[in-house]
Regions:
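N-terminal secretory signal peptides and thylakoid transit peptides that target proteins
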Residues: 1-20
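Sec/Tat signal peptide C-region and signal peptidase I cleavage site
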Residues: 26-30
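Catalytic cores and adjacent binding grooves of peptidoglycan-active enzymes
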Residues: 31, 36-41, 52, 124-180
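Cell wall/extracellular polymer interaction/catalysis modules
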Residues: 44-50
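Active-site acidic/histidine clusters and adjacent loop/turn architecture
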Residues: 56-106
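Structured segments of extracytoplasmic/periplasmic soluble domains
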Residues: 70, 89-96, 100, 121-124, ...
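Acidic helix-start/capping segments at beta-turn-to-alpha-helix junctions
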Residues: 102-116
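Charged, often glycine-rich, active-site loop that binds/positions anionic groups
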Residues: 112-127
């Protein structure tokens, strides 16, 4: 798939994600209608989820709701609909790494208050983070090295990829293509 196709798809999916979770049943403009799945383990809450979140050309409302819960702000339990683009980045990353194991989630959605608190305490977060918009996830893998996760994410050319070896995670988002 060409980068321009992914960008167009991501923009359309981002527009669909602006709708509440209930609205996420619009067919995704994708070439393949193969089911998309992800597996997540929240390192802060101990909760895990393995689910098919897209099938037959539609996002599955209940699965997306469950993903939103797993990726909630663990400091406040606030939940926000995650951008469909970041769900697809996670799904493609899982396929690229060829592993059924769950991603170990360090951070998904962050409320503005949580993000500001982290920013003010010098925790290395961006003041206007994509996490606040539900467009980013910080993760790692048990069976794949951080370097493998970073390289796989960068090969997708689907958004931002940040490499944080000292904190033991890789940041992925569905914003502009960039890396650091």
């Amino acid at each position: 798939m060409h980068a321009s196709s992914l960008l167009s798809r991501r923009r359309l999916l981002g527009a669909a994600a602006a709708v509440t979770t209930v609205g996420l049943v619009t067919p995704a403009p994708a070439i393949s209608y193969a089911p998309r799945s992800i597996s997540l383990y929240n390192t802060h809450t101990g909760e895990w989820l393995r689910t098919v979140y897209w099938a037959d050309g539609h996002y599955i409302r209940e699965a997306v709701r469950d993903i939103n819960w797993i990726l909630r702000d663990h400091h406040t339990d606030e939940m926000r609909p995650m951008d469909a683009g970041v769900l697809d980045v996670l799904g493609m990353l899982r396929e690229q790494l060829d592993t059924p194991e769950p991603f170990l989630v360090v951070s998904g959605y962050r409320s503005p208050a949580t993000n500001m608190n982290m920013y003010l305490h010098g925790e290395g977060v961006a003041k206007h983070s994509y996490h606040i918009k539900g467009m980013a996830v910080d993760l790692r893998s048990e069976r794949r090295s951080l370097e493998q996760v970073r390289e796989a994410a960068m090969s997708l050319q689907c958004g931002g990829v940040g490499y944080y070896p000292r904190a033991s995670f890789v940041h992925v988002d569905c914003g502009p293509i960039r890396h650091w």
